[in-house]
C-alpha cells in the first residue's frame, strides 16, 4: 500500500536480533534500514559506548546518499553523486565500532548468525513461560527476542511498581531490563535475555523475579527502599528533576 502511494518503507534494526540470517528486510519490502550494532552485533552501547547505527538502502536510493561514498575494490576513491544530498558530517561515524560488528559477523559465519537469533528467541520464550503464571504478560503469545511484562496489576495490589522491581533486581546482582517501554504498556518491563545467556543464568533470573514478586506481596517496603547493597542507592528523581545540575561547578 505504501509503495503504491509513492512512499518508502523504513526498517528499525532494533528488532533484527530476532530474524538476522533468517529473513532479509529488503525482501520484506523495506527500502531503508538502520542497524543497532549495540543490540544485534555485540558492540558497546551507552555508557560503554560509543554507539553506532549504520544505515543501508536499496540501489534506487544510492544516487541520493550523503557524500562522499567510497567506491571501488582494488583501489578506493571518494565519489559524490550528482543527486547526492551533500555533506552531513565531516567524518563517518564511529568507525571502530563498525569494525567490531564486522568482526562479530565474520566470526559467527553463515551458520552462526541465524543460530544466534534462534537462541535469542528461544531464551526469551523460555523466560516468558517461566514467569507468566505470576507476572502479567502484555502480549501473552509466542514472542520474538524480547517480551514485555505489565506490572500494573501488581502495583494496584501491592503498591510495587516496575521501578521497584527493577531496583530489587540490582540488589540481587542483575541488571534491570528496559523500564517503562513500550509507552503503551502500563508499568512495563521489557525483558531481552539475548542469545548469550545459558539456561542456568536464565533460571537464576527467573528465580529472582519470582522472589521479588513474593516480596512485593509480603514486604513491599523492602522493595520501596531498594537497592540497599549497591554503592549508590536509590536516587531522588523528583529532586533531580526540580533542581537539575546541568553544568559542573568549578571550585574557586
Each model region followed by its residue ranges:
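Non-catalytic terminal extensions of PLP-dependent enzymes
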Residues: 23, 73, 77, 84-88, ...
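Long, C-terminal catalytic modules of enzymes
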Residues: 50-54, 58-96, 100-107
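Residue-level detector of functional hotspots within protein domains
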Residues: 11, 16, 41, 99, ...
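Conserved PLP-enzyme active-site core in the AAT-like
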Residues: 1-75, 159-160, 187
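Glycine- and other small-residue-rich loops at beta-strand/loop junctions that grip anionic moieties
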Residues: 11-14, 90, 94, 116, ...
Amino acid at each position: 500500500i505504501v509503495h503504491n502511494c509513492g512512499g518508502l518503507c523504513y526498517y528499525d534494526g532494533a528488532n533484527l536480533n530476532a530474524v538476522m540470517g533468517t529473513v532479509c528486510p529488503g525482501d520484506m519490502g523495506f527500502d531503508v534500514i538502520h542497524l543497532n550494532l549495540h543490540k544485534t552485533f555485540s558492540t558497546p552501547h551507552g555508557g560503554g559506548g560509543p554507539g553506532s547505527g549504520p544505515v543501508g538502502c536499496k540501489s534506487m536510493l544510492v544516487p541520493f546518499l550523503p557524500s562522499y561514498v567510497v567506491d571501488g575494490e582494488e583501489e578506493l576513491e571518494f565519489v559524490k553523486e550528482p543527486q547526492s544530498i551533500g555533506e552531513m558530517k565531516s567524518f563517518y561515524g564511529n568507525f571502530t565500532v563498525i569494525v567490531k560488528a564486522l568482526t562479530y559477523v565474520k566470526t559467527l559465519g553463515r551458520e552462526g548468525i541465524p543460530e544466534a537469533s534462534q537462541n535469542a528467541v528461544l531464551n526469551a520464550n523460555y523466560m516468558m513461560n517461566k514467569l507468566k503464571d505470576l507476572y502479567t504478560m502484555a502480549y501473552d503469545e509466542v514472542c520474538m527476542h524480547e517480551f514485555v511484562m505489565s506490572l500494573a496489576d501488581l502495583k494496584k495490589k501491592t503498591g510495587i511498581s516496575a521501578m521497584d522491581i527493577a531496583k530489587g533486581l540490582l540488589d540481587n546482582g542483575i541488571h534491570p531490563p528496559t523500564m517503562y517501554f513500550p509507552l503503551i504498556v502500563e508499568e512495563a518491563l521489557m525483558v531481552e535475555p539475548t542469545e548469550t545467556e545459558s539456561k542456568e543464568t536464565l533460571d537464576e533470573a527467573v528465580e529472582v523475579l519470582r522472589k521479588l514478586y513474593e516480596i512485593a506481596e509480603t514486604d513491599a517496603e523492602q522493595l520501596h527502599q531498594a537497592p540497599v547493597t549497591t554503592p549508590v542507592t536509590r536516587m531522588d528523581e523528583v529532586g533531580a528533576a526540580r533542581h537539575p545540575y546541568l553544568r559542573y561547578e568549578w571550585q574557586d
